[in-house]
Amino acid sequence: MPRTLTASDMVTPGSLSPPPTESTEGEQAGQPLLDGAPSSASLDTLIQHLVPTADYYPEKAYIFTFLLSSRLFIEPRELLARVCHLCIEQQQLDKPVLDKARVRKFGAKLLQLLAEWTETFPRDFEEESTIGHLTDVVGRISPCDETYGSRVHQLLQTLHQKLASLGQGPESLVGADKPISYRTKPPASIHRELLGVCSDPYTLAQQLTHVELERLRHIGPEEFVQAFVNKDPLAGTKPRFSDKTNNVEAYVKWFNRLCYLVATEICMPAKKKQRAQVIEFFIDVARECFNIGNFNSLMAIISGMNMSPVSRLKKTWAKVKTAKFFILEHQMDPTGNFCNYRTALRGAAHRSLTAHSSREKIVIPFFSLLIKDIYFLNEGCANRLPNGHVNFEKFLELAKQVGEFITWKQVECPFEQDPSITHYLYTAPIFSEDGLYLASYESESPESQTEKERWKSLRSSILGKT
């Protein structure tokens, strides 16, 4: 099986090998495309560039980039069918007598391609018809080498295990428990607070990192493309990907939940001294997240503390030592397109590349900004050029961004999970937005006329009071 790909493996456009010598209609695939790096080409040429021969194997950079971006133009199952058809046609695998020496050289490269494809994009092989294409072409070369059958069996076994693991999506991690929303403050006798479950900021930062990496593990690279897919003007129908970005959506929901959990924990206590204590606790948790490299939890905590129901608690904030909070806010300041955060992210990425331990390898980006960057890359450049060619240069940049993310999400979490803490993070009830405002007004009375009118409205709608 292939080793795990790294960002440097995936994207080294200047080192792409020349494509195979077979020609495709209207173009010579044997001609290097921009010194080996295909800036643009027809879809047929790019597919041909993916197909191995006895003497040619595409670079890892090309394989990842094309498999990632091709789904904008062709369904993965159709792409595999075309690759298999080209293999059969070019290697004459439909003939009764095969050139065994040549087929053995080709077969090893074909199995390598299939191994890389199933390892990096396992969800492309969820349909039985896709597996059928794979087993058909391998079945044709198996008589030339008795090891091919066992190697394919192992490949499929690994694939099925990976699909089964991915099928246990993030939602299953919390079992049957579903978070509920508070509308009003519950009696203190029945409410559990986070500080009662975990009072050490570093421990909570570790457990948040555990949750983040577990959720990231389920996001496939293809979801970044499928989230923004538009109908290809040269394709007959739009690929149906609406059900294939669930993990991205679930991860964004987790970020929002953490924001609301932070705000809920702050607004819940009746006394401002306790509220100030909770704020200072979360500031310390956020600082530990920053030190670990967990920027997503860091941003969620800061966002939760900046929600209006929390930020308006002036008497509470007056009791808080805010110096550390302002430093963290500065790091995540959106000014200059988050330039401070991007500098910190580059520092964490460099630390990860030179790491001597799993602890130093952790890089969890602010996910919503990553999605935004990919969205603007997609919107800012056309998928096809005016001549109909695929804009492969755009997809090299896309692969660079996604490939880096894939490297980060594959890091093993070095922190031991504490089920009681992660269970609380997933299932603790949180206030709705209106509930947060009502709790905030009950903690510190409304000051402006607008706040007084809103408080009156919330008391009427939620509590049934006037």
Curated annotation (Swiss-Prot):
Residues 1-35, 443-466 are annotated as: Disordered. GO terms for molecular function: guanyl-nucleotide exchange factor activity. InterPro entries: Ras-like_GEF (IPR008937), Ras-like_Gua-exchang_fac_N (IPR000651), Ras_G-nucl-exch_fac_CS (IPR019804), Ras_GEF_dom_sf (IPR023578), RASGEF_cat_dom (IPR001895), RASGEF_cat_dom_sf (IPR036964). The keyword Disulfide bond does not apply. Residues 200-446 form the Ras-GEF domain. Keywords: Guanine-nucleotide releasing factor. Disulfide bonds: none annotated. PROSITE patterns: RASGEF, RASGEF_CAT, RASGEF_NTER. It comes from the Eukaryota. One of its GO terms (biological process) is small GTPase-mediated signal transduction. Residues 34-164 form the N-terminal Ras-GEF domain. PANTHER family: GUANINE NUCLEOTIDE EXCHANGE FACTOR, RAS-GEF DOMAIN-CONTAINING FAMILY MEMBER 1C. Guanine nucleotide exchange factor (GEF). This is Ras-GEF domain-containing family member 1C.
